[in-house]
């Protein structure tokens, strides 16, 4: 088809659908003996979009995975954290079952169950949320609680979270209302003391107050296509009661709050139960005993805790778990780098002692699984820089000495006459 204003005879052209002349429209597109204007094209697109929206819910109705299926999918990508995966699987299943069947069942109103994830850095909080969204094929966005402030102050407005979610689904409100929002670093917006402050705390308690309605469920007015708000503008109305909010944080020091509560009950003075150091619970064991009162002492306001009824705790990853993370998941780090090297026609081998060394380094840095990539990247940097310019390299071998920075990777060449480089 071509864009035409007049045919060869200079005759005035009209849209074959609405009858408007070429002077009344911006574009007139010509086909074999037929014309269509830009306005009719837009109308056709709107009709098709509406048809797709009507068909989509029927596909979704039969596609809700069971908690067992959700857990099995998480197992493919996330190592360990068995209890957290079970809690998440049930909470997510119940949330989308509620959406699918409406907010009421036999006259009983079904409440919304948002989720709070508590666990150290690099334990898999973000990965769990991302994997869930990918499995359910729903829009997903992340927000950093440390950048949020109350409306009217310098910083990011809490409603910007919904705007980001809309951007992920091309401003399709219906899709956005089925999405998942992950708010990271939620522990960083705790108030500075147990008692309500008489001064304004715009990035702590103030943000918690601002998030309350959004998380519980409200109709948020969001400017279309990310424009700034002004009075004459039409807003997109997004019902957040259908959006699943997952909040996560490391909550450093929460274990001490729990420990104090637990040990206070063991008595004082001559009647106290004396515990040896070896009898004391680990950080993970203490976090598993978290109660709302502990979170209040930490600095979250009671109303905010009430909006996050499902709590899942994640343990710090052990050295063995980090080694598993390096090689077992479907998108394991070693598999990713092997795929990159395969694109150059080269095999990449990680020896077992190299994986041990990577895990030890990550443990020493206290960065959890998040620190694994930077360690591997540093070890392979020079090789990835030189490899595209080299010929006849068949294989690259990484051992413990490479990870420790004592030698370069071993390069194995395909031709016998080629010189081998051991990096010694």
From Swiss-Prot:
UniProt: Zn(2+) binding residues: 15, 18, 37, 40
Pfam families: AAA_2, ClpB_D2-small, zf-C4_ClpX
GO MF annotations in UniProt: ATP binding; ATP hydrolysis activity; ATP-dependent peptidase activity; ATP-dependent protein folding chaperone; disordered domain specific binding; identical protein binding; protease binding; protein dimerization activity
Domain ClpX-type ZB positions: 2-56
SUPFAM superfamilies: Glucocorticoid receptor-like (DNA-binding domain), P-loop containing nucleoside triphosphate hydrolases
Induction note: By heat shock. Part of the clpP-clpX operon, clpX can be expressed individually from its own promoter.
Cofactors named for this entry: Zn(2+)
GO-annotated cellular components: cytosol; endopeptidase Clp complex; HslUV protease complex
Domain of life: Bacteria
Gene Ontology BP annotations: cell division; protein denaturation; protein unfolding; proteolysis involved in protein catabolic process
Keyword DNA-binding belongs to the record: no
Binding-site positions, ATP: 120-127
Deleted gene: phenotype: Delayed and decreased induction of the extracytoplasmic-stress response.
Keywords, comma-separated and alphabetical: ATP-binding, Chaperone, Host-virus interaction, Metal-binding, Nucleotide-binding, Stress response, Zinc
Bound cofactor: record note: Binds 1 Zn(2+) ion per subunit.
Subunit: Component of the ClpX-ClpP complex. Forms a hexameric ring that, in the presence of ATP, binds to fourteen ClpP subunits assembled into a disk-like structure with a central cavity, resembling the structure of eukaryotic proteasomes. Interacts with Mu phage DDE-recombinase A; this interaction remodels the viral transpososome for replication.
Family statement: Belongs to the ClpX chaperone family.
Job description of the protein: ATP-dependent specificity component of the Clp protease. Uses cycles of ATP binding and hydrolysis to unfold proteins and translocate them to the ClpP protease. It directs the protease to specific substrates both with and without the help of adapter proteins such as SspB. Participates in the final steps of RseA-sigma-E degradation, liberating sigma-E to induce the extracytoplasmic-stress response. It may bind to the lambda O substrate protein and present it to the ClpP protease in a form that can be recognized and readily hydrolyzed by ClpP.
NCBIfam families linked: clpX, PRK05342.1
HAMAP family in UniProt: ClpX
Name of the protein: ATP-dependent Clp protease ATP-binding subunit ClpX
Taxonomy of the source species: Bacteria, Pseudomonadati, Pseudomonadota, Gammaproteobacteria, Enterobacterales
